[in-house]
Amino acid sequence: LGTRVAGLTPTPAGIAIAGGNYDAIIIATAPQHAGKLWPALAAAFDFEPIATVYLQFAAKTALAFPLQQQSGKHGQWIVDRGNGLLACVLSGHGDWEALADDELAAALVAELAMPGPPLWHKVIREKRATFACRPNIARPDHRTPDPRIVLAGDYTWADYPATLEGAVRSGRRAAQALLAKSYNPQP
């Protein structure tokens, strides 16, 4: 625990990782990191960005609902975090990526038709936040050619796109596969 895994080596005795040997493992990372450990995944995905723009207004500022869809040019979802803090979520490639943080915050304030500027703002951008869910994308199963190694993550096959629910279901499926001893541990 607390150690970044830089590689793994399947051996007859188990899976060798950072000086340790394990009967089986779950690779539970984002696909771009899983590809470093399991090279067959390395080039399988394109990625989409997500940004969250926090806008702090006066404490009495509130939306009509705690979560609402925004139909403006940039904002998609607005979450009222209480006490005047709004979180604007933007996902997928768009014009917003070219805007500086101050410009993006100002554009969202204008879309929300707020009476004045926020007290402060903070923009968090993740360029590879999720894989691009394109039609007919080939998502890997949790099983790999080595039954002692299973995959978990929202990018693996599921009934859901890239969501937290998909990641949770994937993790459960991977754990159940190993708990069922489908990896044929050594005696």
What is each residue range found by the language model?
Residues 1-3, 9, 125, 153:
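Short loop/edge segments at beta-strand edges and connector loops
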Residues 156-179:
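A conserved FAD-binding loop/helix module that cradles the flavin
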Residues 3-113, 117, 140:
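Mid-domain catalytic core of redox enzymes
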Residues 124-158:
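FAD-binding beta-loop-beta segment adjacent to the flavin cofactor pocket
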Residues 36-38, 133, 161-162:
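Short glycine-/acidic-enriched loop or helix-start segments at secondary-structure transitions
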Residues 179-187:
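Active-site-proximal substrate-binding core of FAD-dependent oxidoreductases
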